[in-house]
Every structure is written in C-alpha cells, then in structure tokens.
Amino acid sequence: MAGLRNESEQEPLLGDTPGSREWDILETEEHYKSRWRSIRILYLTMFLSSVGFSVVMMSIWPYLQKIDPTADTSFLGWVIASYSLGQMVASPIFGLWSNYRPRKEPLIVSILISVAANCLYAYLHIPASHNKYYMLVARGLLGIGAGNVAVVRSYTAGATSLQERTSSMANISMCQALGFILGPVFQTCFTFLGEKGVTWDVIKLQINMYTTPVLLSAFLGILNIILILAILREHRVDDSGRQCKSINFEEASTDEAQVPQGNIDQVAVVAINVLFFVTLFIFALFETIITPLTMDMYAWTQEQAVLYNGIILAALGVEAVVIFLGVKLLSKKIGERAILLGGLIVVWVGFFILLPWGNQFPKIQWEDLHNNSIPNTTFGEIIIGLWKSPMEDDNERPTGCSIEQAWCLYTPVIHLAQFLTSAVLIGLGYPVCNLMSYTLYSKILGPKPQGVYMGWLTASGSGARILGPMFISQVYAHWGPRWAFSLVCGIIVLTITLLGVVYKRLIALSVRYGRIQE
C-alpha cells in the first residue's frame, strides 16, 4: 500500500505559499504523519473488503449445490442479491454511527461481522438441512459488514483537504479495484485442494477449495482489526487543511478550528446519488450480461464463456487501476465535473457500439432448449453462466443463440471486435464516473461529518447492483440486445442531461460560500 503515496501526501497541506504564517500553523509534522497513516489503514480496509466479496464469487454456485442439492438458480439469485441488500441496509446505519462516535467502533464491529460471516460460510456443511438458507444468511452478513465502505470514505473525506481529496479517493478506488481483481486469483490458488480437501475433525472444519478462501479472509479481517486498534486515530481537517474539532475525537484540543458553517446543496446531493446509481446500474448489468451475450453471439460453451469473460473482466480491472492513476493527474487540469461528463459520454459510446448492425446473424441453437444460455425468468438464472462446477461437461451441449429466444432469428450478430471495443470503452468510462461521483459528493458536503450521506450514496450503489441484473435479464431475454442496449443508451442520455442541468451546482461547499477559490 506504500506505493499509493502520492504528491499530495508528500507536500505539507498548509498555507498557499511557503513562509506565510498559515504555512507554519495549520498542521504539525506529527499530526500530518498520523493522519496519513490512518488513511492508509483505511486503504487496506477497503482492499480487504473487496477481496472478501470477490474471493468466493466463482465458487458460490458449485458450493451451494454441494451443501444443498435442493438449491436452484432462482435461489442463487437471492444469495447473490443478499450481499447488496445487507450493504444497502447497513451503510446508512454505520454512517450515522460514525458521525457521533469514534470511527474505530463501526469499523471494528463491521469487520467482526464479516469475520463471523466467513466462519459461518466455512461451516455450511454442518447443518443437517436447510443449508442454503445458512448460505443466504452468511452472504447477507458479509454485505452488512461491507457497509463500512461508507465509514471509510467519510473518514477519508473528512481527513483530507480539497487539494488532497481526488487523489485519496482515487487511491481508495484503486484498492477496491485491486481487491476485486485479486480475489478470484486467490480463489484459483486454492483449487488444488479440490472439493473434498481435508477435514479437521476436532473442530469439524473442512479445508477445501470452497472454505479456504473465506478462512483466509477471516484471518485478514482479524489482522485488519489489530491494525485499526494500533494505528487508526481520529483526524478531521477543513477544506484548507486546518484541524477541526470532532465529536469523534476524544482528545480534541481547544485550539483546533471549528467546522465552517454553511447549508449543503441538497439538489446537488440528490443529483450525485442519481448519477452514482446509474453508474453502478449500467456496469452491474454489463457484468451480468456478457456471459450469456457471448454464448449467444459466438456459440461459446459455458466453459469458454467463463474463461474468456473472466480474462476480459480482469483486464478491465487492470485498466481501471491505470485510469485511477491518470485521473489523479487529469483532475488538476480540467476539474472533476468535466471528467465526469467525459466518462458518461465514453460509456454511452461503448453501449452504442454494442448495438447489433448488419445482415449476419448468430448461430441458432436448435437442440436442448433447456440450456444455460439465457433463460427468461429469474435473476439467479441470468448469472448462472458465471459459475461452473468442475464436474460438468460442456463438450456435448449445443451452443449458439437459443431458439426459445425469438429475437435470435432476426437480430444481427454483435461482432467480436465490436464487443471488445465496447468493453474497453465501458471499462474506461465506468471507473472515471465512479471516482468522480465520490469525489464531487465529498466536496459538496464540505468538512461536516459525512457518514450518513456516504451511507446513502453507498446504499444507492447497492440498490443499483441489485436492480441492474434484474433489468437486463428481463429485457435481454424477451427483446434481445438491440432493445436492451438501446434502453441503456437512453438512460445514459437522460443522466447526461441531468448532469448538464446541475453542472454549476456541483462545487465544493467552501467554494460555494467563497471561503476557497476554485
């Protein structure tokens, strides 16, 4: 995590010019070092939270089938959605908690919940019946633990100046992206243990390819708690970098500056929540649809789709990290609002390119109508292509666009180059929109406690991750990619219009009240 240190961390955030009185009094070297040590601990917390989510994603379906053969794809949808539901409920609660109590409290409690959830996940083989419901509870608890994202971002926003904000938010997003990338890698490293693995009879613990990743995640969670207790300190600064009093800080000194007053622009707050919802909505539906889309368009087997799309998503994750690094530099020249607008336009172009054109049609699948390409009902079935049991054999399964989907007969094929170009553009625009939404949001809120507001923003993103797959599964199954991606393009156009309407209002609270020049 030390590599994430950037220029804004290396320069003292004090006065505007060296030698001025403000340069000497705004922040001591000891306070500065303590502040950034605390922020880096939260970088690690975000990374570990992302790893905890993604480390089992590729194995949930086969593990669910193993512990409870009665589980079907419809129930799988609830298992996947339970994480986002838990996070959506918990984020505002943890955010409110962090506004009035030391941030260590909600952070430690949330991580303990995640550790407990991982331990429950490792023992899902113990109950004699209803094991699938225990998995539902385990994933829901993990989502509740992930509600600490609101605390992490609100702390970082409150502990950085406007000058440092974009860079620090980019670092958090990079850690989150790295966690999503490396989680499946860790999962792969444990596949050599196999489904049976070994059993520790004394504590009835099965150590196999399904349980080892969550046990590792639980261990890292305990390590994270120790680091939080040892290193994290309460720090708050105003938009200029002056230390502020905080109810979270038990030893606040009397010479610290009071938090500047000013009313938050609620229109701007609501607008950013909508923008953030759409950002996560469109990427969640893209992640969901690429497996059935590629199986329909290119006659890939399920195994090929999982492998190739896994590589594509991993590449998009690496692309996101590079984008975060570039945005930190670009934002200093053209500002966050313009970058957000550019990101939305790039995403729109990406989905527009996905629209099918021409006279060539996909291969039609005439046999085995009950295939896994793209059923037309449940949320769980739409994402079933993301999981594949090692015991399954795809060699004899028919491939192509299922005749059950009437649109296969008249919808042109989406060429592979067309799909890859679109993926690159969406992978470029999404991290930009994600980062700029958080950054602008934190600046609009100003130096006041942001826990509740960050909680609502996180909750809106969680809701988007639930609704996005549900939306795309229904539209794609019934009307095909032309209608599905046309509607997405329309949603993005409306979002760009909203951004244009509120563009001038998306400014920092201190800039709005003239305390700082933009």
Swiss-Prot record:
GO terms for cellular component: chloride channel complex; endosome membrane; lysosomal membrane; mitochondrion. Changing T294K: In CLN7; endolysosomal localization; decreased chloride channel activity. Changing Y438A: Decreased chloride channel activity. Residues 1-20 are annotated as: Disordered. Changing G429D: In CLN7; lysosomal localization. A motif (Dileucine internalization motif) lies at residues 13-14. Inhibited by chloride channel blockers 4,4'-diisothiocyano-2,2'-stilbenedisulfonate (DIDS), niflumic acid (NFA), and 5-Nitro-2-(3-phenylpropylamino) benzoic acid (NPPB). One of its GO terms (biological process) is neuron development. It is found in: Endosome membrane; Lysosome membrane. Residues 62-74, 127-131, 195-211, 288-304, 359-412, 473-482 are extracellular. The chain crosses the membrane at residues 41-61, 75-95, 106-126, 132-152, 174-194, 212-232, 267-287, 305-325, 338-358, 413-433, 452-472, 483-503. It comes from the Eukaryota. Keywords: Chloride, Chloride channel, Disease variant, Endosome, Glycoprotein, Ion channel, Ion transport, Lysosome, Membrane, Neurodegeneration, Neuronal ceroid lipofuscinosis, Transmembrane, Transmembrane helix, Transport. Expressed at very low levels in all tissues tested. Its main location: membrane. Outward-rectifying chloride channel involved in endolysosomal chloride homeostasis, membrane fusion and function. Conducts chloride currents up to hundreds of picoamperes. Regulates lysosomal calcium content by reducing the lysosomal membrane potential, thereby activating TRPML1 channel and further release of lysosomal calcium ions. Regulates the pH in endolysosomal compartments and may contribute to progressive acidification from endosome to lysosome. Permeable to other halides such as iodide and fluoride ions. Belongs to the major facilitator superfamily. It is linked to Ceroid lipofuscinosis, neuronal, 7: A form of neuronal ceroid lipofuscinosis with onset in early childhood. Neuronal ceroid lipofuscinoses are progressive neurodegenerative, lysosomal storage diseases characterized by intracellular accumulation of autofluorescent liposomal material, and clinically by seizures, dementia, visual loss, and/or cerebral atrophy. The lipopigment patterns observed most often in neuronal ceroid lipofuscinosis type 7 comprise mixed combinations of granular, curvilinear, fingerprint, and rectilinear profiles. This is Major facilitator superfamily domain-containing protein 8. The gene is MFSD8.
